[in-house]
Amino acid sequence: MEPDDFDGGWDNRVTLVDGRWVDRTPRFPDREPQLRREAALLPWLGPLLPLPVPAPTVVSEDPFTVRHAYLPGSRCPGTSPEHGAEIGRFLRTLHTVDTGEAIRHGARDGDTTYAEVQTTVARMAREVLPLLPARVAASGEALLERMATPPPRTSVVHADLGPEHIRVVAERVTGVIDWGDSGIGDPALDLAWTTLGADRPFADAVLLGYRPDEALVARARDWHQLGPWHEVLYGLGEGGREFVESGLAGTVDRLERFGSS
């Protein structure tokens, strides 16, 4: 995401105001609760973390809009060990935040997030699995079965930590944005792109800073494989055929690379 590419997200319309503020309005009514959660949670959570995050406030109810200070930077390329080291430390801190306090400040509880995951996995089994070529169908089915198992532990998670949500300037990480999917969930989800989708220098630095055990790494691998399935679902809904085709290509690629790991 380039610094001025503010309106490319799936969930919200995003506008830069006076070069200082970011306004976000949901594209669809069912996205509004995400922004309300951010406005409740992030002003409390932000001071506990080692990297900047937005601190949104509600500035309009019709249309519903939140505003926060602009965090300068561009999309993280996922190549720099300096960036990776900062993200590893950030995630280690995030995943030790008190979950009870987070829930009291607006975070979704673990039962809610797990139920949402299971609803999504069931939909993937119905709508995406039949679209997969035969050579990866068994791996896809096994992946969905593993994801139906509750995580061994839960923590506060960002839950959508890809390169477009990490802002960087030169070798500094200047912010972690877009917390609409956050809640109490599987910490391995935050390690999916950061340790498997990024380039090795970045990923290795994340692992060094975070120090996950093998079970967490394996769970992160499963989350990484599941990522493109969401793109297929989005395409089958409002996104259109281009997202279906791109998501299926990504799903097949990841199942072939990681499915037998």
Where are these regions (language model features)?
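Glycine-rich, phosphate-binding/catalytic loops in enzymes
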Residues: A40, G84, G175, A192-T194, ...
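Active-site acidic catalytic loop and adjacent metal/ATP-binding pocket
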Residues: D7-V17, D23, A142-L191
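A general structural signal for well-ordered alpha-helical segments in protein cores
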Residues: E38, L42, Q118-A122, A188, ...
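Short helix-capping segments at alpha-helix termini
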Residues: P47-L51, L131, D213-E214
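ATP-binding pocket architecture of kinase catalytic cores
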Residues: E2-T112, P151
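An acidic site on a long C-lobe helix of protein kinase domains
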Residues: H83-E86, P187, Q225-P228
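An alpha-helical support segment within catalytic cores of ATP-dependent transferases
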Residues: M1, P72, T93-A159, G247-T251, ...
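Helix-rich C-terminal or lid/interface subdomains of diverse kinases
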Residues: D11, D30, C76, I184, ...
